[in-house]
Design a protein with these regions (language model features):
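AMP-binding/adenylate-forming
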Residues: 46-56, 78, 88-170, 180
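Conserved adenylation A10 loop of the ANL superfamily
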Residues: 74-89, 186, 201-204
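Conserved ATP/PPi-binding loop(s) of AMP-dependent carboxylate-activating enzymes
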Residues: 215, 224-250, 271, 283
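Conserved pre-ATP/AMP-binding loop-to-beta segment of ANL
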Residues: 10, 63-79, 86, 109-116
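AMP-binding/adenylate-forming catalytic core of the ANL superfamily
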Residues: 232, 257-343, 353, 360-362
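Flexible, low-complexity linker/hinge segments
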Residues: 39, 55-74, 100-101
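Conserved AMP-binding/adenylate-forming
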Residues: 1-36, 119-122
Length: 367
């Protein structure tokens, strides 16, 4: 019988060694976010059913009554939250991991004799762990550190790394030190260096599947009723509760709004839950945010819908100012110059910081 092994270790060589050990034994791994409070970790373990946990002082057996079986070929369970906020495990197989790593490596032209990955994002998130997985698959050099630090990254022998926009911003003009920077998480900056590749993906897709707007080899993307759907060998096998979210033809509904043009170029508008309906008109936050972010006096911005007695929801720009913020009229004029008038924010709010996840995505529900 195969076991699920929870790994609660900082980023480093030992984490990678424990992944290798588990796979050599035919087991699967569950990375645990060490920043979670004790009660949250307990809920995660109870919900996803590992048999063992690896911590700083070694491997510990968990209650056998709570352990849940795996299928042959299962390699990885990634914890992600469902709509209830309870942990939901995404199950990937060795085959889906290999498909993702192969597609990414082919697109980036990875040469195991020349290239070296730096893993510096949280390993309990697919954006961080996928760096480790693709390096192991391709046989490249790999350095794993417990968090991003500018000087550590620059001093490493890495040619490739994955970052979120806030980390990229900290690198500044030294980003050209790397051959390729794979960028995920929140919306990218307006101006990007030539060596930066923007990505779109989910835990269910095994990390990025669309690079600079184009699907990776072996990835199919289509739009159905305004929602992006994807198909390919890199998709999850199922959730930990056994539910396979793919339809009979293998398509997975992402929950993201977007479009695919006649040439296959993919545009992602945001989570369908983030769509703002104002006076029966539909407004996606992302295009509005990109315009407002270019204005003088705006360090960061998130666009949300606020309750409105007449329109139902009012488009509202939540701005982290950089010096003197723009006026509401300046924001509205800028948006109306590029988008339909109903997309223009009816209000602005100034805040000190935007709440973000570990991978830099704005937590809109917290605004």
């Amino acid at each position: 019988m195969h076991d699920l092994i929870a790994i609660a270790l900082p980023g480093g060589d030992r984490f990678v060694e424990e992944v290798r050990r588990a796979w050599a034994d035919g087991d699967a791994v569950l990375p645990v976010d060490r920043r979670l409070p004790e009660q949250a970790v307990a809920r995660l373990l109870a919900g996803l059913g590992p048999a063992w946990i690896v911590e700083g002082n070694g491997r510990r057996r968990l209650d056998p009554a709570d352990a849940r079986p795996l299928q042959d070929g299962d390699a990885l369970v990634m914890a992600t939250s469902g709509t209830t906020g309870e942990p939901k495990g995404v199950v990937h197989t060795h085959a889906s991991i290999a498909a993702s790593a192969a597609a990414t490596s082919a697109h980036l032209g990875i040469d195991p004799d020349r290239h070296h990955w730096l893993a510096c994002l949280p390993l309990a998130h697919i954006g961080g762990l996928s760096v480790v997985l693709r390096a192991l698959w391709a046989g490249t050099g790999l350095t794993v550190v417990d968090g991003f630090d500018v000087e550590t990254a620059l001093a490493s022998t890495a040619t490739h790394l994955s970052l979120v926009p806030t980390a990229l911003q900290r690198l500044g003009d030294r980003a050209d030190r790397f051959e390729r920077i794979v960028l995920g998480g929140s919306a990218p900056p307006q101006q990007l260096a030539a060596n930066v590749v923007t990505t779109y993906g989910l835990t269910e897709t095994g990390s990025g599947i669309v690079y600079d707007g184009w699907p990776l080899p072996g990835v199919e993307v289509r739009e159905q009723h305004g929602e992006l759907q994807v198909r390919g060998a890199m998709l999850l096998r199922a959730y930990r509760d056994g539910v396979d979210p793919r339809n009979a033809d293998g398509w997975f509904a992402t929950g993201d709004g977007g479009s695919v043009d006649a040439d296959g170029f993919v545009r992602v508008y945001g989570r369908t839950d983030d769509l703002i309906i104002t006076g029966a008109q539909k407004v996606w936050p992302d295009p509005v945010e990109r315009i407002v972010a270019r204005l003088d006096g705006v360090a960061e911005v998130a666009v949300v819908g606020r309750a409105h007695p007449e329109w139902g929801r009012q488009v509202t720009a939540v701005i982290v100012p950089n010096g003197r913020p723009p006026t509401l009229q300046a924001v509205r004029d800028a948006v109306k110059a590029e988008l339909a008038p109903y997309c223009a924010p009816g209000a602005i709010e100034l805040v000190d910081a935007l709440p973000r996840t570990a991978l830099g995505k704005v937590r809109r529900a917290a605004l």
